[in-house]
């Protein structure tokens, strides 16, 4: 358990109750709870949606490290195009109504997806491709 706590940067906070943790720490604790049984599949529904920008970026790094080290299958729902490109090997674009998979885009960027990768033309191209799909729906 101590390795898991360390992997999400919560060492020293093990004895606090959830309401005593910040929002980012609560998200990390929830991630730790989900990982304790070493799942082969991890389902994440907007795991970074309610976090401030700094905490969001730190947890993105934690999730990338987890994926690179443990290799679980991760299905993550997000409304952030940037987050989808940064965190995914494949992005499934879902239609507004009904919710059907319209397009699957394979993201062929190197791991880890650090600031250098995010500043690359390839990253921008993937974001533009996904934005064009949403523009076709009239939602952007």
Show which residues each predicted segment covers.
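Conserved H-loop
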Residues: 71-77
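ABC ATPase nucleotide-binding domain "signature motif"
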Residues: 22-28
């Amino acid at each position: 358990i101590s390795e898991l706590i360390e992997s999400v940067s919560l060492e020293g906070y093990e004895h606090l109750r959830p309401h005593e943790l910040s929002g980012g720490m609560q998200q990390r604790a929830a991630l730790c709870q989900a990982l304790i049984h070493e799942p082969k599949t991890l389902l994440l529904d907007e795991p970074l949606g309610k976090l401030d920008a700094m905490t969001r970026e730190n947890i993105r790094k934690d999730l990338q490290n987890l994926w690179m080290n443990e290799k679980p299958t991760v299905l993550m729902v997000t409304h952030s195009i940037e987050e989808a490109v940064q965190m995914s090997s494949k992005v499934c674009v879902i239609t507004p109504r009904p919710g059907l998979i319209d397009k699957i885009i394979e993201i062929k960027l190197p791991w880890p997806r650090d600031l250098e990768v995010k500043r690359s033309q390839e990253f921008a191209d993937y974001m533009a491709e996904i934005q064009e799909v949403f523009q076709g729906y009239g939602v952007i």
